[in-house]
Amino acid sequence: MTNGVVAFGEILMRLSPDGYSRFKTADRYDVYFGGAEANSAETLSQLGIDSRFVTKLPANALGDGAVTSLNRFGVDTSFIVRGGDRIGLYFLESGTAQRPAMTIYDRAGSAMAGAEASDFNWDQIFEGADWFQFSGITPALSDEMAECTLLALKKAKEKGLTTSCDLNYRSKMWAPEKAREVMGKLLPFVDYFIANDKDVLGIYDNHTWTESDPKKRAEEMEIWLTEQFGFKAATIILVVSDELKRKGTWASLYENGKFYSSPFFLADMVESVGAGDTYAGAFIAARKKGMTDQDAVNYSAATSALKFSVPGDANILNEKEVLALVNRSADDWISR
């Protein structure tokens, strides 16, 4: 790997009832592998950026399946630690019409949740890398993983790597007070902060934000968080509606005291899982490709919108498709 991105976190095996079946009547399940940092690493690789995913997986066929799922996207898995009793699971029932999606986690006691800081040799892991990415899910796994993430961040800064964090707050994993405490120790070591507004609202529920205008609220969040933690830049991705009530993505970037916002990208809903992770991966790719601030936020929001068209956790795309979406008119929806 040369000038690549190291992503650190847990990859889960996902089981989803076929189509729009309900959990209580399903007799067939589709299987996917995914996780916040893994999804970002897969996006990076497809956009031409070397990526390395670091985790701990059981030394069994299910762990092998997770590794294979990463390899097929070109992600380096050479530093995945093998051991522990089980892979984390989650179950996703797809929503439709007025019925929202439903998620059930079964990740307690997973190999990664039980991992120790000594499992990971960061001097070796960071060889050939110039960027370190994690999300708020990793330190939420256990106190040990919170400490391990802090050690990794300190080592990354010591070695001169750029660092980024996708906030990814999960209320089923920890309370806002605990999340604020732990993330408050990690975020001062972060250069680029990435989030959606709901995750910021979830953790920083003790702060007052604008309620009526999501875009204005995103900008308030970016300013406040940058002032609190000293980020080089903060960017927030939103799922919003246009004047016809169609869903789509919009993103804001705050860097060097200036705001940059993307156009609205229509996102017809096949599946939303992984859209934020895709945004994080695309944003890192844009920074590494040397794009301007405006081009970076446009590129990242477009990549996220494309994820809504793909089932499963991972986005399946190429850069040509992303650039076509960024550049085409709203009426040009057929590639000929």
Model-derived features: positions:
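Glycine-rich phosphate/adenosyl-contacting loop at the front of the ribokinase-like
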Residues: 1-75, 96, 115-118, 268-269, ...
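A short helix->loop->beta-strand "cap" motif at the edges of active sites that frequently abuts
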Residues: 157-162, 229-232
